[in-house]
Amino acid sequence: MSGQTTSEYIGHHLQFLKTGDSFWNVHIDTLFFSVLAAIIFLAVFRSVAKKATSGVPGKLQCMVEILVEWINGIVKENFHGPRNVVAPLALTIFCWVFIMNAIDLIPVDFLPQLAGLFGIHYLRAVPTADISATLGMSLCVFALILFYTVKSKGFGGLVKEYTLHPFNHWSLIPVNFVLESVTLLAKPISLAFRLFGNMYAGELIFILIAVMYSANAAIAALGIPLHLAWAIFHILIVTLQAFIFMMLTVVYLSIAYNKAEH
C-alpha cells in the first residue's frame, strides 16, 4: 500500500484486468481464474477416477466419493426425473463455484503483487465477485429451466403456462404474461446477485482488514486476529454460497420439469 491513500488502495483492488473501458469489455482476470478453477476441478476428479480402487480408498478418493454420493442424494430427493444430466451438473456447479469462492481466502495482496512482477497492474482473482460471471452462470441455468419446461410440457405447454396462468381467461393473457415473466426472470437474477453480493462483500472486508496493516502498530496488531476470524468464518460463506447456488439450480430445474404433473 506504499504511496497510496486508503481510497486509492481499495479502488486499485476493485479494478478488473479488462480489454477496454466500454460496456462490452472482457474481464480477463475473471475468465482466467474461472478456467483455472475448472481445470483444478477436472484435474482432481480425473486423478481420483484414474486411481480409484475397489480396495481401501485413499483420503482424497474417500472425500470425492462422499461428495458425489451426497450431491447425488440431494438430486435424487429433489429432482424427480432422469438424473443423468442434472446430477453431474449439480456436482460441477458445487465444486466449480466452491473453488472460485475459495480463491477469496488467498491474502488480497499476494496475487496482485505476483501479477505485478509480470507487468499486470490490475487483478481481481475472485470470479464470483464479478457480476458478469455470476450472471453468466445464472443465464445458463435460465436456459436449462426453459429447456426442461419445454421437455416436460412441450412448446405449446410453455406458451399456455405464460399466457393462461394464474388467470385462465383470454382477456387476462397480458396480465398473466407479465406476472409469469417476472417470476421467471427473478430466478436467474436473484441467483446471480445472491452469489455476487456475498462474495463481493467478503472480498471487500478482506481489503478493509488489509488496510489496517498500514496503520499504526496497535491497529495493525488488531488486524491479525480480525483477519484470522474473518477467514475462518468466510470458509462457511464460501461453502454455503456454493451449496445454495447448486441447490437452487436443482430446485428450479425440478419445478420446470415437474410442472406437467401439477
Curated annotation (Swiss-Prot):
The chain crosses the membrane at residues 25-45, 86-106, 130-150, 204-226, 240-260. One of its GO terms (cellular component) is proton-transporting ATP synthase complex. NCBIfam families: ATP_synt_6_or_A (TIGR01131), PRK05815.1-1 (NF004477). CDD domains: ATP-synt_Fo_a_6. F-type ATPases have 2 components, CF(1) - the catalytic core - and CF(0) - the membrane proton channel. CF(1) has five subunits: alpha(3), beta(3), gamma(1), delta(1), epsilon(1). CF(0) has three main subunits: a(1), b(2) and c(9-12). The alpha and beta chains form an alternating ring which encloses part of the gamma chain. CF(1) is attached to CF(0) by a central stalk formed by the gamma and epsilon chains, while a peripheral stalk is formed by the delta and b chains. It comes from the Bacteria. Gene3D superfamilies: ATP synthase, F0 complex, subunit A (1.20.120.220). Pfam families: ATP-synt_A (PF00119). The lineage of its organism: Bacteria, Pseudomonadati, Pseudomonadota, Gammaproteobacteria, Pasteurellales. This is ATP synthase subunit a. It is a multi-pass membrane protein. Keywords: ATP synthesis, Cell inner membrane, Cell membrane, CF(0), Hydrogen ion transport, Ion transport, Membrane, Transmembrane, Transmembrane helix, Transport.
